[in-house]
C-alpha cells in the first residue's frame, strides 16, 4: 500500500514528505525533484515570493546512490527564508519580551474570507490565525510535488507512461478545446508563461491576468492532467473506495483552492443524451478501438486503456490585494482582511501539483495490481498481465477494416 504524509509550515525550517510502500530499484535523484519543484514555481501572475523562493532538496532516507531501497522515502524541502522567521516560528519556547518587538509576530486576528483562518481559529482554539495559515498554506504542496516526483519516476520506469498537465482556462478566458497533448508536448507547455497548449488560449489567459492585476484582484482557472498508455484494469468496480475515479477526486480535492474535479468530459457529458455520451467500441487489428474518450479513460472505476483525463477547477486566490470585509476576532468589530504576500494567479502551478497527486494515486493503484518488492519484479508482473490481457482481447479477423477506420477518423 503506497502511503504519503507531509509535515511542516509555510515559514518553518522545512517541509518534509514521507512516501511509504515504494518498491526498490526506482531511479531518483535530488535533481529530479528539484526540476519538478522548479516547474511548480512557473506561471504568469505569480507573486514576489517566487522570485527568491528556492527549494533546497535533501533526501533524508530511503534512497542510496540514486536508487530507492524499498523502505520509506523521506524528502526535505528547505525554506531559504528561515533565518527571517526563526524566532517567530521557533518550535521551542521564546521569551515573550523578545517576540513583542518583532513585526512578523503581530497577532493576525482578521481572518481572510476563503481561507482556513476563521474555522481553524475556532476549531483549534487559536486567538491568532498564524498557526492556521502556516499549515494551510499552499506552500505545503511543494512536499507533495517532491514525493509525486518519485511516483512519476515509478510509473515511467515500470509502465512506460508519463503524467503531464496543461491549463484549460484562467478566469473568463476562452477555454482550450483542441487536441489532448501528450508527453512530447510537455516542453512546449512548460515554455508557455501560463502553461497553455495553444497560442490563442495563452493570449486570452494573459489578458485575463493583466486585467485582474490592474484591478487588484485574483483569478482561478481549470487545469487538465493527462496520463496516456495506462493498461486496462487499474482500480476496481467492487466497492466505492476501490474505484480509481473516487480516489483521484479525493486526491485532487485535497489540493489547496481546488473546488471541483471532473473525469473526462464530466459536467459536459451530464448535459448530453446517453446516445451521445459514451465511447463506442470498435474491433481493430490490435484490439478494440474507441471513437471518442468522453469517459476520460475510466469506466466503472477502472482504467479502460484510453488516456486518463482529470480536470481540476481552482478558485481565485483568497488573499486579495483589494482586501475583503471581515471581523476582527479580538474585538468583534468590522474590519478588512489581513493581506499576506500572494499571487494574482497560481493556476499554472496547480497543474504541476495535480500531476503529483494523480501520479501518486495511479502509482498506488499500479502497485496494488502488480505488486513486487523491486522494480524488476513489478515489471515482470506487468509484462505477464499485459500478455494475458492481449490474449483475451478480441481482434478484427476479417479483411473489413471499415470499423477500425471509422474509429480512427472520429477519435476525440
UniProtKB/Swiss-Prot annotation:
Subunit structure: Homotetramer.
Binding site for FMN: 135-137, 256-257, 300, 315-319, 341
Required cofactor(s): FMNH2
Co-factor note (free text): Reduced FMN (FMNH(2)).
Protein name, as recorded: Chorismate synthase
UniProt-annotated binding residues for NADP(+): 40, 46
Function: This reaction introduces a second double bond into the aromatic ring system.
Listed Basic and acidic residues bias regions: 391-404
Pfam families noted in UniProt: Chorismate_synt (PF01264)
Region: Disordered, residue numbers: 391-412
A biological process term (GO) from this entry: amino acid biosynthetic process
InterPro entries linked: Chorismate_synth, Chorismate_synth_AroC_sf, Chorismate_synthase_CS
Family: Belongs to the chorismate synthase family.
Keywords: Amino-acid biosynthesis, Aromatic amino acid biosynthesis, FAD, Flavoprotein, FMN, Lyase, NADP
Annotated pathway: Metabolic intermediate biosynthesis; chorismate biosynthesis; chorismate from D-erythrose 4-phosphate and phosphoenolpyruvate: step 7/7
SUPFAM superfamilies: Chorismate synthase, AroC
Catalytic activity reported: 5-O-(1-carboxyvinyl)-3-phosphoshikimate = chorismate + phosphate
A single GO molecular function term of this UniProt record: FMN binding
A GO-annotated cellular component: cytosol
PROSITE patterns, A to Z: CHORISMATE_SYNTHASE_1 (PS00787), CHORISMATE_SYNTHASE_2 (PS00788), CHORISMATE_SYNTHASE_3 (PS00789)
Amino acid at each position: 500500500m503506497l502511503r504519503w504524509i507531509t509535515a511542516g509550515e509555510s515559514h518553518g525550517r522545512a517541509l518534509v514528505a514521507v512516501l511509504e510502500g515504494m518498491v526498490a530499484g526506482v531511479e531518483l535523484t535530488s535533481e529530479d525533484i528539484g526540476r519538478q519543484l522548479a516547474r511548480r514555481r512557473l506561471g504568469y501572475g505569480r507573486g514576489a515570493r517566487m522570485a527568491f523562493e528556492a527549494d533546497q532538496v535533501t533526501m533524508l532516507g530511503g534512497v542510496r546512490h540514486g536508487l530507492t531501497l524499498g523502505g520509506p522515502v523521506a524528502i526535505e524541502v528547505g525554506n531559504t527564508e528561515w533565518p527571517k522567521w526563526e524566532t517567530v516560528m521557533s518550535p521551542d519556547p521564546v521569551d515573550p519580551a523578545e517576540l513583542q518587538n518583532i513585526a512578523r509576530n503581530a497577532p493576525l486576528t482578521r481572518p481572510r474570507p476563503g481561507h482556513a483562518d476563521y474555522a481553524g481559529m475556532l476549531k483549534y482554539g487559536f486567538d491568532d490565525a498564524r498557526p492556521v495559515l502556516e499549515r494551510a498554506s499552499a506552500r505545503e504542496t511543494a512536499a507533495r510535488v517532491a514525493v509525486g516526483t518519485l511516483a512519476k519516476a515509478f510509473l515511467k520506469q515500470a509502465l512506460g507512461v508519463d503524467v503531464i498537465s496543461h491549463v484549460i482556462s484562467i478566469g473568463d478566458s476562452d477555454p482550450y478545446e483542441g487536441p489532448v497533448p501528450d508527453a512530447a508536448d510537455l516542453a512546449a507547455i512548460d515554455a508557455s508563461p501560463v502553461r497553455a497548449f495553444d497560442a490563442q488560449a495563452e493570449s486570452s489567459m494573459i489578458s485575463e491576468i493583466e486585467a485582474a492585476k490592474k484591478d487588484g484582484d485574483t483569478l482561478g482557472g481549470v487545469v487538465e492532467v493527462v496520463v496516456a498508455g495506462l493498461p486496462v484494469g487499474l482500480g476496481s468496480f467492487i466497492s466505492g473506495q476501490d474505484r480509481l475515479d473516487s480516489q483521484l477526486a479525493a486526491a485532487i480535492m485535497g489540493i489547496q483552492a481546488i473546488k471541483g474535479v471532473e473525469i473526462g468530459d464530466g459536467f459536459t457529458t451530464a448535459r448530453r443524451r446517453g446516445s451521445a455520451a459514451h465511447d463506442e467500441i470498435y474491433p481493430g487489428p490490435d484490439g478494440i478501438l474507441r471513437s471518442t474518450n468522453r469517459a476520460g479513460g475510466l469506466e466503472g472505476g477502472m482504467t479502460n486503456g484510453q488516456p486518463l483525463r482529470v480536470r481540476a477547477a481552482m478558485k481565485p486566490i483568497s488573499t486579495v490585494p483589494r482586501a475583503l470585509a471581515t471581523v476582527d476576532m479580538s474585538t468583534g468589530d468590522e474590519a478588512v482582511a489581513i493581506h499576506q504576500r500572494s499571487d494574482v494567479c497560481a493556476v499554472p502551478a496547480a497543474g504541476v501539483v495535480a500531476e503529483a497527486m494523480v501520479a501518486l494515486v495511479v502509482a498506488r493503484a499500479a502497485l496494488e495490481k502488480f505488486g513486487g518488492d523491486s522494480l524488476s519484479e513489478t515489471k515482470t508482473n506487468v509484462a505477464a498481465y499485459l500478455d494475458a490481457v492481449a490474449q483475451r482481447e478480441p481482434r478484427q479477423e476479417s479483411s473489413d477494416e471499415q470499423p477500425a477506420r471509422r474509429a480512427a477518423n472520429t477519435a476525440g
